[in-house]
Amino acid sequence: MRNTFILTLLLLLNIANISANIKNLNNNWKFFYGDIPEAKYVDFDDSEWKDIRIPHDWAFENGYSANASQKDKGGYLGGGIGWYRKEIYLTEKDLSDDFIFIDFEASYMNNQVWINGNFAGERPYGYIPFSFDIKKYLVEGRNIISVRVDNSMEPSARWYHGCGIYGNVSLRSHKNAFFEKDGIFITTPSKDKVCVNAKVISAEKSANYLAKLEIFDKAGKCKAQSETLEFSTNNNLSLIHISEPTRRSYIS
């Protein structure tokens, strides 16, 4: 059996500061097992809550039970509802970026997020990463992140799952323009052509950018490159032709 080996693709754009500023938020969270709707508010007193670090799994933390709501399919662990809160401090410089997102790598399940008492969004079910644009809710100085995670409808899976925020949490900011998170898609219409679909998010409603596509092999040698391409925030990038595509054989 023979498969075409797809070479590494590099996109070089002339957008200033296109790289993200990322701040890890895993440390110094407060956690409460139970449902307290008032926990979304800034002035809520969480001083008696448990100090935890992300990643966190309250089902495993609470232990096993023959009567646990996940039953045998979930390893005899429980479910329920949990609340998380975190305090962060931001400077005027931190808030100067055009876009500020909060990124959750994984949280199970049915997540709701508030920033300073403002509802930022929700992510039904679990397993996949999710993000919310929270710049408009942030202030200089003290900010409160509140997260409600609902595992009250158990069993909810055919195997053990964690309960809570079990993946990294981070604050991600961009100036002016950036590639949408997980927004670059590469397809091969034929063995010698690569099609790139790259979505750019811009602070300007309509903007044009220049891009150059280069493809490198495993040794770092440039195998193909495009001319400088002009595209807008609403258009895709173009095809690039590879005159001598590298192939790799697989035996199965």
Model-predicted regions and their roles:
Residues 240-252:
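Single conserved hydrophobic/aromatic residue that forms the stacking wall/gate
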Residues 30-60:
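Predominantly extracellular/luminal regions of secreted and cell-surface proteins
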Residues 23-27, 32-35, 74, 79-181, ...:
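Accessory beta-strand-rich segments of carbohydrate-active enzymes
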Residues 4-14:
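Sec-dependent N-terminal signal peptides
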Residues 18-20:
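Boundary at the C-terminal end of the N-terminal hydrophobic targeting segment
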Residues 128-130, 234-239, 243:
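Aromatic sugar-binding surface patches on proteins
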Residues 176-204:
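Surface beta-strand/loop "capping" patches
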Residues 193-231, 238:
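Beta-strand-rich binding/interaction modules
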